Amino acid sequence: IASIIVMDPDILVLDEPTSNLDPRGVDDLIEIISYIRARNKTLVIATHDMDFAAEILERCYILDGGRIVGEGGCESVLTDMNLLEQHGLKSPTVTRIFSKLGGLERLPFRLKDAVDLFKKLRGQ
């Protein structure tokens, strides 16, 4: 990725960037992507890793058979468990965990959101 960043492209396409990365590598990748985004560059990322997608993406498109079957802000797309499962994907881990609690008005989809919600629930 570093050799591409040096070329300063307006658009960067990453295909399954978390493939074969350990958790530390994923964290490093998130830092690199944050660096790229801070420079107002466009990123197109193809991934099956919904936890990764939840942490870094603003807008999500769900593709199945080359067709867009879902799109929108990542919060609405990644918490639509039926849509994702219907197309062979899993919701982010925190969304699946908190969905089991039931009775929540809004499911978290990012780890930070889950931590904030957990703190709020504990305080009540």
Protein language model regions, located:
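Catalytic Walker B motif of ABC-type/P-loop ATPase nucleotide-binding domains
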Residues: 12-15
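A short, surface-exposed alpha-helical micro-motif characterized by mixed small hydrophobic
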Residues: 53-55
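Helix N-cap at the start of a conserved alpha-helix in ABC-type nucleotide-binding domains
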Residues: 23-25
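ABC ATPase "signature
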Residues: 71-72
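ABC ATPase nucleotide-binding domains
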Residues: 84-124
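H-loop/switch region of ABC-family ATPase nucleotide-binding domains
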Residues: 47-48
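Conserved ABC ATPase "signature" C-loop
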Residues: 65-66
